[in-house]
Curated annotation (Swiss-Prot):
GO terms for molecular function: large ribosomal subunit rRNA binding; structural constituent of ribosome. GO terms for biological process: translation. GO terms for cellular component: cytosolic large ribosomal subunit. Belongs to the universal ribosomal protein uL14 family. InterPro entries: Ribosomal_uL14, Ribosomal_uL14_bac-type, Ribosomal_uL14_CS, Ribosomal_uL14_sf. This is Large ribosomal subunit protein uL14. Keywords: Ribonucleoprotein, Ribosomal protein, RNA-binding, rRNA-binding. CDD domains: Ribosomal_uL14. Part of the 50S ribosomal subunit. Forms a cluster with proteins L3 and L19. In the 70S ribosome, L14 and L19 interact and together make contacts with the 16S rRNA in bridges B5 and B8. The gene is rplN. PROSITE patterns: RIBOSOMAL_L14 (PS00049). Binds to 23S rRNA. Forms part of two intersubunit bridges in the 70S ribosome.
Amino acid sequence: MIQPQTRLKVADNTGAKEIMCIRVLGGSRVRYGRVGDIIVASVKEATPGGQVKKGDVVKAVIIRTAKEYGRPDGSHIRFDDNAAVLIGKENNPRGTRIFGPVARELREKQFMRIVSLAPEVL
């Protein structure tokens, strides 16, 4: 469950380390973001020489949440952290690598490029 002001780890090599959610996209009444949702965020921490700088406003897709969520088969899944991947035009990732596992729900939401770059899909 990601809402405005939530801080997330960045799980790619764009140079951003931490972002803060500004808005969950998808209508005026969307309060929380789940895995696969797109958010608008501000870069709060970045490495020098990266693609993005501190203060940049970026779009990102949520790939992991610490709050568990149910799947249609009755199982539940949760992760150790809240993490996102920065995306650009046409929802393609801005980085060339993704760190850590990603959820299977990203495949259903058509983020195939992120799924293919991920080391593990849970």
